[in-house]
Amino acid sequence: MPLLLDICPRIWYNTAMQTDMEGLWRTVTAGETGEKFAAFYAMLTEANSRFNLTRITGEEECRVKHFLDSLAGMNYFPPNADCCEVGSGAGFPSVPLLIARGDLAFTLIESSQKKCRFLETVIKELGLRASVVCARAEEAAKGPLRERFDVCCARAVARLNTLAE
């Protein structure tokens, strides 16, 4: 009898990935972290009703496309890493990573004043180890932030070659 992997590797891979991510979700939402994810979702949807943070607002879609997507690489961050997120927007992937990995610290770089205020509120309310720099990445990179971080990340900000500059 052929294995599912032999017949359709993509279906097998997607099913295995989904199973792994569901397990991850159950693990990271136990106890206090689950409450923080719920609070972040509530803050996100409330703020999104006033100004555009994201088009993804449904609970299940947000869980999969924002939270789980943000957490997919969390085990690649070294312990106690000092991290930077360029173009933080609504806080993905930084906020889910900060909730799930309390050992991480983030500097969030965002150019929109409204989004910076939202991120500052989230950080304060959830007690996260993060700070917000309200500036364009090109400008922030010229100052004391340059080459300071263990890990830098970005999501849906720019083409990779532009971002790497």
Report each predicted region and the residues it spans.
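S-adenosylmethionine
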Residues: D103-E165
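Short coil/turn segments at secondary-structure boundaries
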Residues: G58-E61, C84, T107-E110
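Conserved SAM-binding loop of SAM-dependent methyltransferases across substrates and taxa
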Residues: A90-D103
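Class I SAM-dependent transferase core
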Residues: I7, W12, M17-N80, K114-R117, ...
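Conserved class I S-adenosyl-L-methionine
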Residues: N80-G89
